[in-house]
Amino acid sequence: MISTNDFKTGQTIKFNNNLFQIVSFLHVKPGKGAAFVRCKLKNLRTGSIIDNTFNSGIKVELAFINKNKIQFLYIDGNKYIFINIANYEQIEIEKQKIKNKIKYLYEGIIVDVVIYNDYEILDINLPEKLNLTVTKTEFIEKKDVKTNYYKDATLETGLVIKVPLFIQQGEKIIVNTQTGLYVSRCNK
């Protein structure tokens, strides 16, 4: 159990029979009345974010989650197959659990898996930035440069993003997985 006075960003709590990660919190001490803690909580099972207010000093159950390094192997229907790097155990994750991260997965990528109670897989965490190869890009003529500063590029994972005009097919670029935006050329 943890007091609401001891909340920290990133902690995981059990509340209303669900697992929530504390995204942000604010201790409020009004001039009149009892103090309270206003929180923004992310449901780890659904991904939704809620706002909640706790009375100051009440106890909430702390949930312990594990993170393990896993490597993506292949797709089998609606299941994505990974291997745990530590013990070489094969892990199957349903497509719906990682639906918004599928567009960044390629064979061999290493990600963190978030597990509750050693059996319930909640999510995967991608690296903040990935080096990906451009497999297809539009050709833009020089006369169109005044209007188009970015063009579409298809990456090796199938993801389509906007890139600067100088990026060509076959080049490696860095993509931010949080925003889905082009960062820079890859120097490697």
UniProtKB/Swiss-Prot annotation:
Transmembrane in keyword set: no
Major site of localization recorded for this protein: cytoplasm
Keyword field: Cytoplasm, Elongation factor, Protein biosynthesis
Subcellular location: Cytoplasm
GO biological processes: peptide biosynthetic process
Biological pathway: Protein biosynthesis; polypeptide chain elongation
Pfam families linked: EFP, EFP_N, Elong-fact-P_C
Record's GO cellular component terms: cytoplasm
The keyword Glycoprotein belongs to this UniProt entry's keyword annotation: no
One GO MF term: translation elongation factor activity
Function: Involved in peptide bond synthesis. Stimulates efficient translation and peptide-bond synthesis on native or reconstituted 70S ribosomes in vitro. Probably functions indirectly by altering the affinity of the ribosome for aminoacyl-tRNA, thus increasing their reactivity as acceptors for peptidyl transferase.
UniProt-listed HAMAP family: EF_P (MF_00141)
Protein family membership: Belongs to the elongation factor P family.
UniProt-recorded name of the protein: Elongation factor P
Organism: Phytoplasma mali (strain AT)
Gene: efp
